[in-house]
UniProtKB/Swiss-Prot annotation:
One GO-annotated biological process of the protein: lipid A biosynthetic process
Pathway: Lipid metabolism; fatty acid biosynthesis
Mod. after translation: 4'-phosphopantetheine is transferred from CoA to a specific serine of apo-ACP by AcpS. This modification is essential for activity because fatty acids are bound in thioester linkage to the sulfhydryl of the prosthetic group.
Function, as annotated: Carrier of the growing fatty acid chain in fatty acid biosynthesis.
Gene designation: acpP
UniProt superkingdom: Bacteria
Full protein name: Acyl carrier protein
Amino acid sequence: MENIEQRVKKIVAEQLGVNEAEVKNESSFVDDLGADSLDTVELVMALEEEFECEIPDEEAEKITTVQQAIDYVTAHLDK
């Protein structure tokens, strides 16, 4: 079973059409990986589906890097 970090990075790579090797923890979805606002919405939806959790819009707006996505999922997965 892949850990949360690997799963998040895989989803980011798939959603943004980038090589998984380019997806670093500190990568910004917009600045480093070329995401636009629609990409980020789709990314949040993919994370919600993968981890069976709901990410409210106000929280989703704060998730701008790969590490923030990993941290959010990790913090909310057990709830």
